[in-house]
Amino acid sequence: MVDASIIIGIHGLANKPPPDEKPTWWRQALIEGLRRNCGKTTDLLSFDFLYWADLRYPAPVSDNDNTQPYWSDQGVDPFPAYRSHKWTEIINVAEKIIGTELDFVELHTGISRINDYVLERELTDLGAYYDDDGFRTTVRKRLRDKLLEHRDRRIMLIGHSMGSIIAYDVLRMLGREEPQFRVDHFITIGSPLGLPHVKFKISQENDLVRTPSIVGRWTNFADRRDIVAVDAKLSDDYEPNDQGIKVNDVPVINAYRSPANKKPPNSPNYHKSYGYLRTPELSELVRAFA
């Protein structure tokens, strides 16, 4: 019997572990979040995954080269929630400063210095996505086919980092090509969708920079310390769709740290997908959906 609901993930920028390993780790991170944050012990999570790193890299990341793999945290308490975190006030102030700079520079020059740094230094795959027609067409088709494969089910689509851009673009395409198709919940984590250059690219293909028409709900999760999600408030940038669906921005604490047996040990990564996937705020949505 096929489950009525399914969660579909799409990974972000840079090379990844093998295609049979990466989705397993995403699924385990979601399940760990349910167990730690919601007290729900289950392995029965209907999950599918769109892997695209092979389109950019000749071989996946090996175990020896992967310094920040998924690993199950040894604690038993819930992961830290944003509302109770000791750094909340400091992070809020930092967000206001960064957001003000982004908006001011974009308003008066059309570009952002922070945006340029992120695109040039951190998001080389994104440059290829916009410059390489073959890559862009192929990765979009992969996700489009994956979504349509599950068209008779309730779908939660989770896009991390650059994967959130690919997901957004495909959802806008499907809105034009398959207007009856539905994605119940679109979730973006560590997303660069707020960058001015990304919004400009969206505006070149679409009438408005807005919520995709086929989406019933859109939630954006961002750790304020995540440089890729430097503009964390997408609700300021994306108009609602015709049904009035607007993106809901939810700040979170990405508590991921690298394992003790990797160098550097116990190193934080505020952009890491596994940290986002086991935040209490995301776990609550997964629990209610699944």
PLM feature spans:
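Lipid deacylating catalytic domains
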Residues: 1-53, 57-63, 101-158, 162-290
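N-terminal accessory alpha/beta regions
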Residues: 44-91
